[in-house]
Amino acid sequence: MALDSAKKREIIAKFGNDEKDTGSPAVQIALLTERINEINEHLQQHKHDHSSRLGLLKLVGQRKRLMRYLKRKDHDKYLEVITALNLRDRV
């Protein structure tokens, strides 16, 4: 379940340094969060879709690793990202 390009550009513009900044941890966390939310909505309707559930767990783990990295390298940006995305400080 990929994000459409308009939504992706909007997220990159909000969290990136410029419109081509797709690799910074903040942008990656925001994109992963959006994908996680979409898959979560899908799983609420399709409870027996186990392959999507495994993909969701993989994305959550990847986001957790990126959040841990961002917290260690740039704590202020980390706090800004988790408040903007309504995430908990669990890492």
Curated annotation (Swiss-Prot):
Coiled coil: none
Pfam families xrefs: Ribosomal_S15 (PF00312)
Protein name: Small ribosomal subunit protein uS15
Gene3D superfamilies: 6.10.250.3130, S15/NS1, RNA-binding (1.10.287.10)
Domain of life: Bacteria
Subunit annotation: Part of the 30S ribosomal subunit. Forms a bridge to the 50S subunit in the 70S ribosome, contacting the 23S rRNA.
Family the UniProt entry places it in: Belongs to the universal ribosomal protein uS15 family.
Function: One of the primary rRNA binding proteins, it binds directly to 16S rRNA where it helps nucleate assembly of the platform of the 30S subunit by binding and bridging several RNA helices of the 16S rRNA.
SUPFAM superfamilies in alphabetical order: S15/NS1 RNA-binding domain (SSF47060)
HAMAP family reported in the protein's UniProt record: Ribosomal_uS15_B (MF_01343_B)
Disulphide bond pairs: none
Keyword annotations of the record: Ribonucleoprotein, Ribosomal protein, RNA-binding, rRNA-binding
GO biological process, one term: translation
UniProt xrefs under CDD domains: Ribosomal_S15p_S13e
Naturally occurring in which organism (per UniProt): Nautilia profundicola (strain ATCC BAA-1463 / DSM 18972 / AmH)
Keyword Hydrolase assigned: no
Gene Ontology molecular function: rRNA binding; structural constituent of ribosome
GO cellular component terms given for this protein: cytosolic small ribosomal subunit
NCBIfam families named in the record: S15_bact (TIGR00952)
